[in-house]
From Swiss-Prot:
Keyword tRNA processing: yes
Domain Rhodanese: residue ranges: 130-225
Lineage, highest ranks first: Bacteria, Bacillati, Actinomycetota, Actinomycetes, Micrococcales
Protein name, UniProt field: tRNA uridine(34) hydroxylase
NCBIfam families tied to this protein: PRK00142.1-2
Residues the record marks as active site: C185
UniProt source species: Kocuria rhizophila (strain ATCC 9341 / DSM 348 / NBRC 103217 / DC2201)
Family: Belongs to the TrhO family.
UniProt keyword list: Oxidoreductase, tRNA processing
Uppermost EC category: oxidoreductase
């Protein structure tokens, strides 16, 4: 019986020959039988792949045979069976596209100058100790935060990761420079960079949630400071940490709570938006708010 699994991981470490690592990763993934997205750069590797549990384990074993990746923090989750339509392995200038390659220095120890890493338990201790002085700062895009976020979190106005530099330089968050900022994202990689960019701009007390929302959910589920669902970058689109998770997202058609994203039916758009199963099943127009007047 097939048991589908998905793994998420990243490693910041200098790679002298990203093209060679790309070819090795392509061969390893194909040989193991996994699909997903793998990004390689001079800064390291960032990947989300899935498949049958035996295939995924074979991939992880092969990955850790390469010394720079042997200590990769592998985050496991349940898959649905066909979570990735294909395998993509690419070389890019940055592991995460902040458009700031010259502002980031990576050594064999990771990203230099980033925020202090905190485990989920240490985050709770910080909140207990400093109360309202602690501010959660979302390192994801607005779309992702619609269905789930930390309670009271600041969610920057971003459509892509490239928008963060513009947002930070706008001065809109300067009033938080004396706060204890806890940055968070899905698995932790975006906050490795974002926390450093914040510190470079005068934010003095910056932290990052080690392992991201995924590790927090494993530790506390829906019993802690997290509310809602977690947006994920595969065919599932979202995952929950318990059956009692409360959805924060709202269907654009009827306003009911839903974590369900669909693509706009307008072929010139295809933007993701929230639409519940009832509205989709009832044949309601599955177009985003911007495209409702546009014929599909």
């Amino acid at each position: 019986m097939s048991v589908p699994k998905i793994v998420l991981f990243y490693v910041f470490t200098p790679l002298a020959d990203p093209e060679a690592v790309k070819l090795w990763q392509l061969n390893l993934a194909q040989r193991s039988g996994v699909k997903g997205r793998i990004i390689v750069s001079e800064q390291g590797i960032n990947a989300t792949v899935g498949g049958d549990i035996h295939d995924v384990k074979a991939y992880v074993r092969g990955l850790k045979e390469y010394a720079p990746f042997q200590h990769a923090d592998i985050k496991w989750s349940d898959g649905a069976g066909d979570d990735f339509p294909r395998l993509s392995v690419k070389v890019r200038p940055e592991l995460v596209t902040f458009d700031a390659p010259d502002l980031i220095r990576v050594t064999e120890h990771g990203v230099e100058g980033g925020g202090t890493h905190l485990t989920p338990h240490e985050v709770h201790e910080l909140v207990e100790r400093r109360g309202e002085d602690v501010v959660f700062f979302d390192g994801r895009n607005q779309l992702e935060a619609e269905i789930g976020r930390f309670r009271g979190a600041v969610v920057p106005r971003t459509e892509t990761t490239r928008d963060f530099l513009r947002e930070l330089d706008s001065g809109a968050y300067d009033h938080l420079k004396d706060k204890a900022l806890v940055t968070y994202c899905t698995g932790g990689i975006r906050c490795e960079v974002l926390s450093g960019l914040l510190r470079n701009r005068g934010f003095r007390d910056v932290y990052q949630l080690d392992g991201g929302i995924v590790r927090y959910g494993e530790a506390y589920g829906d019993r802690g400071l997290w509310d809602g669902s977690l947006y994920v970058f595969d065919e599932r689109r979202h995952m929950e940490f318990s059956l009692s998770a409360r959805s924060l997202g709202r269907c654009v058609q009827c306003g009911e709570a839903t974590p369900r994203y669909v693509n706009c039916a307008n072929q010139q758009c295809r933007r993701l938006f929230l639409c519940c199963e009832t509205c989709t099943g009832a044949g309601a127009r599955t177009r985003c708010a911007d495209c409702v007047p546009v014929a599909a």
